[in-house]
Amino acid sequence: MAVNLLKKNSLALVASLLLAGHVQATELLNSSYDVSRELFAALNPPFEQQWAKDNGGDKLTIKQSHAGSSKQALAILQGLKADVVTYNQVTDVQILHDKGKLIPADWQSRLPNNSSPFYSTMGFLVRKGNPKNIHDWNDLVRSDVKLIFPNPKTSGNARYTYLAAWGAADKADGGDKGKTEQFMTQFLKNVEVFDTGGRGATTTFAERGLGDVLISFESEVNNIRKQYEAQGFEVVIPKTNILAEFPVAWVDKNVQANGTEKAAKAYLNWLYSPQAQTIITDYYYRVNNPEVMDKLKDKFPQTELFRVEDKFGSWPEVMKTHFTSGGELDKLLAAGRN
């Protein structure tokens, strides 16, 4: 009897030790845009450490999925169980509500700055010494200048490039649509290669040596400049530019099914913390935290930013007017071929 009791006590002790030593594990999948790999590779480890500290040692692992954000959103609608999305265009988050009811209609009001913890604008990457003397948008329509940026039909990055060029021309031309269309026709005609995504455009410009100017997010052109330091690329930020917001959201239906709602919300809220905001600026993204930005005035040139919604209307209107089949983009491309 004493032996059996001893065995029971021993088993109970072993079980309690196993339970005490058991560390819960949580996993998040972040579905993000094509050129954000390095940014989130830097952001994820400090949050994983903070989560473990705040949650009794719970081991959190954040996995990443990267591609064009429109393609990423489609994958979620088709069943990818991403917990959070960090995209470069509002429409690619909105479609998760419109087509899948995976998030609520008011998703943009759940986090500060329209659920955009950081933003960027467009930058020009030019070759060493700026041999074509590129300083602003009007320099990009000269006949001796060849441009590289992705196809606006497949790239959110390129849609911002197109809209930024249109907005700058509209301002310069005093709202004369005919003159703006002439500018845009030549601007698009000067594109030497239309890659499908941002990384493909980088390869075309930096490794294949095509084009005089690569147009991409300010964050991306600065990181390319650092990556290909030996080539001596230079960055030019035009005077009139576009506000490119980077919206984020937790995917309600998925986090509820995955049991990850608490971690997903904490992760996206943490992106607004001073620690995260500082890391974000290390990768040349701009943030709305004045204390962080005041220390970096030399890093981010002043530029006059306009919002897509103020210049063009809502994103659904923009997509319908400019980027659907037969829209303004197709008409301008056709005009450039004539």
Swiss-Prot record:
Example of a GO MF term:
molecular carrier activity
Instruction: For this UniProt record, give its keywords in alphabetical order, as a comma-separated list.
Output: Periplasm, Signal, Sulfate transport, Transport
Gene Ontology cellular component list = ATP-binding cassette (ABC) transporter complex, transmembrane substrate-binding subunit-containing; extracellular space; membrane; outer membrane-bounded periplasmic space
Q: Principal place where this protein is found?
A: periplasm
Any Pfam family: SBP_bac_11
Signal peptide (from-to): 1-25
Localization, UniProt: Periplasm
Asked if the Swiss-Prot or TrEMBL record annotates the protein with the keyword Kinase, the reply is: no
InterPro entries (alphabetical) = Sulphate/thiosulphate-bd_CS, Sulphate/thiosulphate_BS, Thiosulph/SO4-bd
- Show the CDD domains listed in the entry: PBP2_CysP
Q: Which Gene3D superfamilies match?
A: Periplasmic binding protein-like II (3.40.190.10)
- Please list the GO biological process terms of this entry: sulfate transmembrane transport; sulfur compound metabolic process; thiosulfate transport
Q: What does this protein do?
A: Part of the ABC transporter complex CysAWTP (TC 3.A.1.6.1) involved in sulfate/thiosulfate import. This protein specifically binds thiosulfate and is involved in its transmembrane transport.
Q: Record's NCBIfam families?
A: 3a0106s03 (TIGR00971), PRK10752.1 (NF008022), PRK10852.1 (NF008106)
Quaternary context: The complex is composed of two ATP-binding proteins (CysA), two transmembrane proteins (CysT and CysW) and a solute-binding protein (CysP).
Q: Which family does it belong to?
A: Belongs to the prokaryotic sulfate-binding protein family.
Q: What is this protein called?
A: Thiosulfate-binding protein
